[in-house]
């Protein structure tokens, strides 16, 4: 009875411990379900500082466009005029006044409206840059995730091969003890096993590097296990108009908006050829009486002031020329961006096609041939008709072909992801 009671208690204790361990794992940062590419993209887009920064810039220009179209605040004038300093008697002199007035400045030409339009173009530029930042972020996350997937999958392939090599080491040691093989076979088997361990260590280091790169966008989730399935990307569009896709790209839209904003700077500079003016109205209160005994009349004054842009050679002309050069610079920058995007598209499209051909070659021929060669070498070695060195070369060739097949598939997907940055998926 006592023994049964103890067994029941032990089972309950084990169950409780398992529950505690599972519960603890659920709350460990980085522990969780396998991370898919889609999840990584969504996590990265949640709070990317570049995107948020451009969005804030766009809102700031939008707010500025409202203030840019508003007239300057009017000025209120208060004062005492022509006060006698011997007595400070406001009724002593006929010209003494207490004045109150208001003045309003009016900027040159249509400068307010043009400045508003310029701020609106700058807002559109920042909005487009936010969209471009989103595309770049998704592309960067895809590149890092694909590279991470390669390292994880490559490590699994090497682990499978290591188990085979470990068995071969055991077999050669047994055969050596029985006198059926020489010592060189044992040494070579151990050497190849150590080389596999070295390759695994290098791959593990790269895996950790890509996880750290991914962590800058998604945090501790980057250290989760990743999905075993090969990452799927949106399909590339068929029959795409490349020039239209590039012209409508957010980066080009941002550059184009900058060009339009620079053109508005030219229009603003041209407004300096027009006079700026101001209007003022003031009222003067007078105290005391006239010599005939009547009360002194108050004074009212209305003025219009404006400047005359006579000397334009070294000021207005230079400002217009400066604005024109800035516009040219913005246009050249947009042209360069167009060329860069076209270069990226052409390069990645050719890369994707070449890798697609190589994937077909590996799937249709190389993988099966390498596997058949490996099996044949193993059977031949077991039958005593081939040397151990030939067997090891066949096994290593199969490993290299499997790793290269994985590399080609990942490289094709990487080119695919970079093409999607251009086409917008």
Residue positions per predicted region:
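Bacterial Sec-pathway N-terminal export signals of envelope proteins
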Residues: 33-80, 105-106, 114, 120, ...
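Periplasmic alpha-helical coiled-coil/stalk elements that build and connect Gram-negative outer-membrane
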Residues: 11, 35, 133-248, 258, ...
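Amphipathic alpha-helical coiled-coil segments
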Residues: 51-65, 133, 137-158, 167-169, ...
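N-terminal secretory signal peptides that target proteins for export/translocation
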Residues: 1-14
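Small/polar (Gly/Ser/Thr/Ala-rich) solvent-exposed segments
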Residues: 52, 74-95, 105-132, 152, ...
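Membrane-embedded beta-strands of outer-membrane beta-barrel proteins
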Residues: 100, 302-304
């Amino acid at each position: 009875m006592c023994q049964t009671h103890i067994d029941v208690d032990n089972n309950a204790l084990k169950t409780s411990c398992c529950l505690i361990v599972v519960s603890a794992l659920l709350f460990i940062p980085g522990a969780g379900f396998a991370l898919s590419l889609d999840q990584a993209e969504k996590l990265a887009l949640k709070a990317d500082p570049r995107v948020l920064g451009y969005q804030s810039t766009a809102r700031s220009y939008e707010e500025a466009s409202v203030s840019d179209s508003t007239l300057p605040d009017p000025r209120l004038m208060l004062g005492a005029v022509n006060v006698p300093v011997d007595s400070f008697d406001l009724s002593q002199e006929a010209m003494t006044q207490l004045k109150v007035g208001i003045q309003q400045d009016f900027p040159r030409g249509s400068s307010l409206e043009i400045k508003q339009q310029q701020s609106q173009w700058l807002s559109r530029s920042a909005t487009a840059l936010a969209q471009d930042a989103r595309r770049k972020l998704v592309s960067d996350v895809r590149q890092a995730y694909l590279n991470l997937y390669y390292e994880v999958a490559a490590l699994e392939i090497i682990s499978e091969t290591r188990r085979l090599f470990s068995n071969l080491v055991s077999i050669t040691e047994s055969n050596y003890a029985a006198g059926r093989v020489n010592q060189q076979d044992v040494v070579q088997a151990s050497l190849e096993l150590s080389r596999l361990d070295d390759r695994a260590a290098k791959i593990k280091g790269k895996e950790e590097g890509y996880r750290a790169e991914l962590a800058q966008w998604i945090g501790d989730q980057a250290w989760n296990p990743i999905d075993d399935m090969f990452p799927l990307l949106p399909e590339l569009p068929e029959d795409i108009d490349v020039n239209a896709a590039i012209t409508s790209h957010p980066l080009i839209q941002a550059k184009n908006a900058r060009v339009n904003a620079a053109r508005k700077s030219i229009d603003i500079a041209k407004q300096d050829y027009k006079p700026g003016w101001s209007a003022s109205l003031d009222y003067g209160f007078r105290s005391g009486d006239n010599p005939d005994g009547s009360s002194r009349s108050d004074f009212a004054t209305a003025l219009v002031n404006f400047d005359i842009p006579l000397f334009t050679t070294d000021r207005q002309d230079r400002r217009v020329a400066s604005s024109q050069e800035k516009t040219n610079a913005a246009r050249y920058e947009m042209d360069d961006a167009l060329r860069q995007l076209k270069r990226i598209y052409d390069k990645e499209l050719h890369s994707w096609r070449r890798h697609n051909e190589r994937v077909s070659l590996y799937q249709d021929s190389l993988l099966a041939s390498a596997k058949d060669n490996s099996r044949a070498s193993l059977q031949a070695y077991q039958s005593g008709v081939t040397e151990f060195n030939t067997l090891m070369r066949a096994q290593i060739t199969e490993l290299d072909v499997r790793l290269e097949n994985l590399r080609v598939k990942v490289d094709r997907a990487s080119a695919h992801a970079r093409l999607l940055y251009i086409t917008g998926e």
